[in-house]
Amino acid sequence: MNWINGGIDRDSTLAPLPDVANRFQALYDSFWNQAHLAPSTLELCRLRLAQLHRSAADWSRVDCEIDAEKREHLADWSSHESFSDAERACLEFTEIYAMDVQAISDELAEAVKAHYGDAGLVTLVEALGIFDGMTRLSLLWQLASVEH
């Protein structure tokens, strides 16, 4: 339960504002239904943000099913063999984004573009903006971890 309205998760917290909730959900869903970047890669990036920000609520959330081994070894993405080069490029970009967006180098952007093109890079940046913002709101709202 959060301190705003007693909601237990993001959806129930936003429910009293149906216009906002519906528009946000449409935007959020669009990331999982686009053709430029694999949804499983976006989920890895979203989960990595949850790890970095220590958000149990966002870590427990499942927006896209991913390989259990990847989830288990996400903190070791740079060295674990289960991650592809494309996933590594996106995860490295995600970590820098989380720490200091101004520190994102041309090389990091080019690494993502090498796998996903310009449209994939734009999709990643837009998704990270939403994921990072929602992770920070989960912490601010003090949302609890919810089993799905």
Language-model-derived ranges and their functions:
Residues 1-148:
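Hydrophobic alpha-helical segments
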